[in-house]
């Protein structure tokens, strides 16, 4: 049986030339490199361009996305979509829950409030092994998944704008 998570979406609304922001948390450099590689490959395949903004950790990603959206709009070069990339590994305290839940909530709030296409590629895992399995482009490729999600939402936005 085909993996339903990988089934191509039928909407092929053109997203070539889209300007996409990637905000990445560089807390785990090697894992982040893999997430970024997967996301960039998907954007290139779709003909989208991208800028990368780096922040210290996952909690800083939502604010950085909001700041960048505002700055780009003010400069007359608005972003069409954004991708959040990072990794949160469970430790011995509740910090994991706070970071994973609050970053996801803030990204969702931002996307809904601004009607802005956003793919969340902040992986939340129990172990380094789980992180690698999710980050590698040849494996679960969560960076690529986040890019596909952002582009899918952009396609919906563009298609409905024409209706």
UniProtKB/Swiss-Prot annotation:
Active site annotation, chain numbering: 95 (proton donor)
Assigned GO CC terms: cytosol; riboflavin synthase complex
SUPFAM superfamilies according to UniProt: Lumazine synthase (SSF52121)
Pfam families attached to this UniProt entry: DMRL_synthase (PF00885)
Pathway(s) served: Cofactor biosynthesis; riboflavin biosynthesis; riboflavin from 2-hydroxy-3-oxobutyl phosphate and 5-amino-6-(D-ribitylamino)uracil: step 1/2
InterPro entries, alphabetized: LS (IPR034964), LS/RS (IPR002180), LS/RS_sf (IPR036467)
GO biological process: one example: riboflavin biosynthetic process
Catalytic activity: (2S)-2-hydroxy-3-oxobutyl phosphate + 5-amino-6-(D-ribitylamino)uracil = 6,7-dimethyl-8-(1-D-ribityl)lumazine + phosphate + 2 H2O + H(+)
Keywords: Riboflavin biosynthesis, Transferase
Chain residues that bind 5-amino-6-(D-ribitylamino)uracil: 27, 58-60, 87-89, 120
Enzyme class: transferase
Annotated EC: 2.5.1.78
Superkingdom per UniProt: Bacteria
GO MF annotations, alphabetized: 6,7-dimethyl-8-ribityllumazine synthase activity
Annotated positions binding (2S)-2-hydroxy-3-oxobutyl phosphate: 92-93, 134
Function: Catalyzes the formation of 6,7-dimethyl-8-ribityllumazine by condensation of 5-amino-6-(D-ribitylamino)uracil with 3,4-dihydroxy-2-butanone 4-phosphate. This is the penultimate step in the biosynthesis of riboflavin.
Xref: NCBIfam families: lumazine-synth
Similarity annotation: Belongs to the DMRL synthase family.
Protein name: 6,7-dimethyl-8-ribityllumazine synthase 1
